[in-house]
Amino acid sequence: MKMVFRWWPNGDDTVQLEQIRQIPGVSGVATMFSDIPAGEVWPKETILALKDQVNKAGLEMEVIESVNVHEDIKKGLSTRDEYISNYITTMKNLHEAGIKCICYNLMPVMDWFRSRLEYPLSDGSFAMAYEHSVAQGLSMEKIIHSMMDGSQDMTLPGWEPERFPAMAKDIEFYKNVSAEEYFKNIRYFLDAVMPYAEEYDLDFGVHPDDPPWPLFGLPKVIGNVESIRTFLGLNDSPRNGLTLCTGSLGANTENDVPAMAKEFCAMGRVPFVHLRNVRHVTKTDFHESAHLSTEGDLDMYEIVKALYENGFDGYIRPDHGRRIWDEVSRPGYGLYDRALGACYISGLWEAVAKSHR
């Protein structure tokens, strides 16, 4: 496996490439252009310039997270073909720049949601949290404010400002879209892009819904093992894969994350893994935690063991970290706790690997 670290370019991150380079075991970054709106082509020269910057820092740039899918594609509107064509052009440009993996989201309207971006933990650190009753009682205006007020004036992934004006209208639109219709629109997209994913040697890893249950009346795509099987069955290309996000899937107490890792890695359909832990407060309330198994409710050792034993050879990254040591950063994406998480994951991987000698 290759360990990567999520990073935003163009001054939109408090973490520097030179700092990432000093984290043991990290070989590269997972990055994106948050300033290019969904549906527009990513220029090849822009991609190459960023890759050059990353390479000069001694790191690789082989993972993109994310190339956002335009909402018209998800809605199945007549304009979708133009946006799909642009997406395919971006894929070609990424391939020619040496990109190997694209992580992307198919949740409608928003990629993820937390009711609190700074939830105080008993050790004095802060983590993101989800409280279902609070979330369900929020207006659209308060939904946006709850996410933006604690963003430290940085772009939150999946909450790019361009989305805000249409959010209320989009949520209303999806009230009349069944899960079956939504999956039909997704299949149309997959059938269009997967032949090019194979031609361009690009692995696609769809990110699970976060949280993995119905939210604001929106259709759900991936929240449990059955929906993952359904999604992968929409297009049987080996490039049509899953980003196994342990924290997203693990928020549902009924999900057996090690079993998921075993099943879908054995199929060769997991090109990318996000490893993080969560602590369940109730069946639908949770907060994020430090990566260690003892700090949350997921057995990180068993997850890593399942990955290793079932042939995982893709990319992995420490996911959301707590805010510790008075760091000022994008919520969930500071340097310190994610660096600790990276070292912990590397240690687990080494222990599992050596136990199989």
Predicted regions mapped to residue ranges:
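Histidine-acidic metal/acid-base catalytic patches
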Residues: 1-4, 9-11, 52-55, 72-76, ...
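Catalytic domains of carbohydrate-active enzymes, especially glycoside hydrolases
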Residues: 9-34, 53-57, 96-102
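A short glycine/small-residue-enriched secondary-structure motif
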Residues: 22, 59-74
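Glycine-rich, proline-tolerant flexible connector loops at the mouths of alpha/beta enzymes
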Residues: 32-48, 216
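Conserved beta-strand edge residues that scaffold enzyme active sites
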Residues: 34-35, 68, 108-109, 211, ...
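An N-terminal, globular interaction/scaffold subdomain
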Residues: 43-59, 64-66, 83
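Glycine-rich, histidine-containing beta strand-loop boundary motifs that form or position
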Residues: 63-65, 103-107, 208
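Active-site-proximal, glycine-rich beta->alpha crossover segments in alpha/beta enzymes
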Residues: 93-97, 101-186
